[in-house]
Amino acid sequence: MTFETISVTLEEGKTLVFETGKIARQANGAVLARMQETWVFSSVCAANLEEAVDFLPLRVDYQEKFSSIGKTLGGFIKREGRPTEREILTSRLIDRSMRPSLPNRLMQDIQILSYVWSYDGVTLPDPIAICGVSAALAISDIPQTSIVAGVRVGFVNNRWVVNPTKAEMDVSRMELVLAGTENAILMIEGHCDFFTEEQVIEAIEFGHKHIVTICKALKDWQKHIGKEKNTSGIVSLPEEVQSAVNTFVEGKFVDLLKIKEKKAFEAASKQLENEVIEQLQEENEVFTAFNIKIAFKQAKSNFIRGLIREQGLRSDGRSVTTIRPISIDTSFLPRTHGSCLFTRGETQTMAVCTLGSEAMAQRYEDLNGEGLAKFYLQYFFPPFSVGEVGRIGSPGRREIGHGKLAEKALSHTLPDPMKFPYTIRIESNITESNGSSSMASVCGGCLALMDAGVPIKTPIAGIAMGLILEDDHVTILSDISGLEDHLGDMDFKVAGNTEGITAFQMDIKVEGITPDIMRAALAQAKEGRQDILETMKQALAAPKTDLSQYAPRIETMQIKPNKIATVIGPGGKQIRQIIEEAGVQIDINDSGLVSISASSPQAIEKAKSIIEGLVGEVEVGKIYEGRVTSVVPFGAFVEILPGKEGLCHISEFSKQRIDNVGDFVKQGDTLTVKLLSINEKGQYKLSHKATLSE
């Protein structure tokens, strides 16, 4: 294979370059994509499956090599291993972008690997990875229904920016990653600072304009160097099987849909499926159990979609705009800082808020350096939530993704950390699941924050929207169930308050989703969100004014950066002494912001007093509570601040004459003194007598 390259310019200084033919020539497709000095290598490979499956076995792994920034991992193990949260989230972005572009019944095991080989700290690598993977698929022999591209959109200085730099993203009011084809959007993921629905649509349209440019370039490249597509792995369902199944189940889905409870519905559906297989299965390659199972799923899908399209009725009896019944129990757990049991239909979460000091913050390390997350939401999805037996251990990709979406939704309503200096952890423990559990996490998490007394700016709620698209007939569904998510054409999650949006995520299974459809979905989502917020308001109208008695108390104070070493002391001796003496936890950042946490206000005040003494500057005319360090015939030496000692002469002890200072004070006594002056040698002249008349 010869070396080939193509470039696409999005904006001035932002040119995407794709190369192939030099690296990984044995892969089905391999591309090195680069912008500036950020280079991402991507490969795609396919293998035939030994037996048929009813899903697309697509595996995506994205990895950021620390060598790309000239570093190695810290710690004992220097080899990249378990993926970071950022790598998992980017892998999901690539998967969700590519999966809709692959044929439904492609019976091949497909693996996508994407590596960041060079990172300049300016150009963010994830949209480059999406485009690089799409390019590798386009020129490979793996069948693809359409060419995909992806971009990031930011909002900087009141204008939209495509593939913003890291510095631009640091000040952007929106982060949107979207992927699509020349004609449609397939995936969006983002969060923003209470943007309107129309602003979100505007951002999507802006991003799609650049996606079209990339797709056209990759399409031309594919025509020029692409391999012939191998369609032998695409297996079609014999028409006679689908026809026979349709005939057998005719009229039986009506009775099935009378069952409203999820587990009972699934059991009855499985029983009917087994009956169909038992009646129609034959000893040939056509009427196999697998083909009949696929045909049954298609028949069930067609019936439920038709019911929605023609009658506006859903499988659980709701109208297209009806939200499932909601129940809310705040302060559900007695010893937590804040909690809420949030139930919407058959989806339920036990949301818990925990407050702590900076020591509780989540530490992380990626290509942009080390950091601290003082707010994080962790989503747990145990197998019992869907009545199954399963693995318990480290979180899966789905748990990471759902947790991050809910976290972003709530992050925009948090108070100023200078006014509320707590680290905040939200747990969303899913105890029942039948669709929209990530949006239940937003609602439950918000109520847990309010129950904990976190002074949020405004309540936030989330809702998942669905879509049934048949030819030109569009039906939008509010608050979709798990079945509707599976059988529908769109999963569009939207979170925000009554006025604006804070987070959104959309996955599309079909082409043809226009801006007008998204606009209608967002408008319907706003109505549903407002209804949910009203229900939440009835349960808890505003954040509690007091923190839980079990939550730590935290206060901050500012010291000069050049005084940090004084507070810490040699080898940390001084700060350890303060922590032990006052019974507190202390965190100090590089700017000199000191965070003090303790179980009581008295302990905090004691620590603040000690620190103020350490960093304070003496003032002439100020009165101090000093400690007598030594007594001499002509007076006493008194420490007025740590390390700052002066002489109180015998004549300055009393208005009456005294002959022996030892009769008046002893070493270790506390003595109130006034600083009268500081001489040219920096020595302090103190007076106890001067405080007696004041």
UniProtKB/Swiss-Prot annotation:
Subcellular compartments: Cytoplasm
Keyword vocabulary terms for this entry: Cytoplasm, Magnesium, Metal-binding, Nucleotidyltransferase, RNA-binding, Transferase
Domain S1 motif, chain residue ranges per copy: 621-689
Cellular component, GO annotation: cytosol
Binding site for Mg(2+): 485, 491
Xref: HAMAP family: PNPase (MF_01595)
Homology family: Belongs to the polyribonucleotide nucleotidyltransferase family.
Protein name as annotated: Polyribonucleotide nucleotidyltransferase
Taxonomic lineage: Bacteria, Pseudomonadati, Chlamydiota, Chlamydiia, Chlamydiales
Gene: pnp
